[in-house]
A protein has these predicted regions:
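Hydrophobic side chains in well-ordered alpha-helices
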Residues: 19, 48-49
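Short phosphate-engaging motifs
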Residues: 45
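Short glycine-rich, basic-tinged beta-strand/loop micro-motifs
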Residues: 28-42
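Generic structural detector for well-ordered beta-strands
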Residues: 10, 39, 78-80
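C-terminal structural segments of small proteins and small subunits
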Residues: 50-83
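Intrinsic-disorder/low-complexity, polar/charged segments enriched in Ser/Thr/Lys/Arg/Asp/Glu/Gln
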Residues: 4-6, 33-37, 74-76
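Residues within well-formed alpha-helices
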Residues: 22-25, 39, 52
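An N-terminal amphipathic alpha-helical segment
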Residues: 2-32
Length: 83
């Protein structure tokens, strides 16, 4: 699946809660309507991003996917700034 995005944040190797902490800071610096692609290796980030975007008032989770890269799972999240 392919998603359009405006900026990429690489948080590979970071453990909870750092992928969310860094993503919040980065997405808040984007213009409204832009999408941030976040690439993580922490499997727990899938549920973390779902929970965060359900409760946050200024972001929307527009997609998630898991891809394999040299035998390693990468969890990719697409977060849109809405306000």
């Amino acid at each position: 699946m392919s998603f359009q995005y405006h900026q990429t944040l690489d948080v590979k190797g970071a453990k909870c809660p750092m992928p969310l902490v860094k993503s919040r800071k980065t997405v808040n610096s984007l213009p409204v309507g832009n999408v941030l692609q976040v690439i993580a290796t922490d499997r727990g980030s899938v549920a973390d991003f779902q929970g965060w975007t359900k409760t946050a008032k200024n972001v929307e989770l527009v997609g998630q996917e898991t891809i394999q890269n040299n035998g390693q799972a990468l969890y990719v999240h697409y977060v849109k700034r809405t306000a």
